[in-house]
Structure formats: structure tokens, C-alpha cells
Amino acid sequence: MASSYTGLGTELMTTGENAGTWGSTTNTNLQIIEQMVGGYVEQAVTTTTTLSVSDGSTGATLSHRVIKFTGTLSANATVTIPLDVQQMYVLLNGTAGAYTLTFKYVSGSGSTVAWAATDKGTKLVYATADHATNPNMVDSGISSTGAHDLDLSLIHI
């Protein structure tokens, strides 16, 4: 039985597979996991930008925890991701231009996350991969542009 891959590209080896070479595969998987936990990457966007993951490869934009979108928009822009990607992201809208930016799955009618034309803030977003054809994006509502209170009433010291 051959290896399978997660939505973010880590290789799941089957028992007995890759004899003598599993170290290389494991190192690549650990690098991908490191990116998922705390990696930062900048991604230039245009009108439509499709992000993808190559199985068993490091460096995919989507495998990073923090993504800063850059570039000068000349129209409303959309960034799409594959249906099977499930990840918590910190997304920064570092684009120039008074146009909207939307982050969504490549297809389906699930919910999306959008920045207004003048919103150049940061969002904490969960890509749920909760449905095979209509997955949802969950915007935590925590952003760099709003005021938030930290409630410590349930913490016992």
C-alpha cells in the first residue's frame, strides 16, 4: 500500500514502506509541521490567486501558520485554497489599493472571510474542511483593527 498525504502535504507512510529512506521523509514531514505551527510567508495576490499544496514538499504557502497578503490590487481580489485544507491561520492584509480581499475554498457555497476595501488588518481564521463540497471559513472576530477586552474572571491563581 502506498503512502497517503494530509491536506497540508505531510506524508503518512504505511508500515514497511520506505525502508532505508524513511529518515528523509520524516525530516520533510517535520519541516512541514514546523511551518504549520509557526511559519510566516508573504504571498503576492492579484485579482484571483489560487494557493495549493504539493504532497511531501516544504514551502507551500498554505502550510504556514501566518500568511501576509501583499501586492497592489487594481480590482477586488480572491484567494482560494483546496477543499481538504484544515488549518488555523493568522492572515494579514498587507495589500495596497482600495479593493476587497476574500479568502475562501476553491469551490462550494461555504462561508468565506473578507476584508473591506479599507480594512488592512489581521484576522484569525479557521479553515474547517468540514464538508466535502461546501466547507466553511470561520472568522474568529479577533482582528488587529478592533478593540478587545481580555476576560480573566475564570482564571484562578
Regions of interest found by a model, annotated:
Residues 1-101, 149-154:
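Exposed extracellular interaction/assembly regions and N-terminal maturation sites
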Residues 141-151:
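Glycine/proline-rich low-complexity spacer/linker segments in large multi-domain proteins
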Residues 18-24, 119-121, 133:
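Extracellular interaction modules
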Residues 113-117:
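A short, surface-exposed interaction/processing loop segment used at functional sites
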Residues 84-86, 118-122:
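Tight coil/turn sites that cap or link beta-strands
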Residues 25, 120-129, 154:
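Extracellular disulfide-bonded cysteine-rich modules/repeats
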Residues 30-39, 97-106, 111, 124-143:
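Short, surface-exposed terminal/edge motifs of secreted or surface/virion proteins that either
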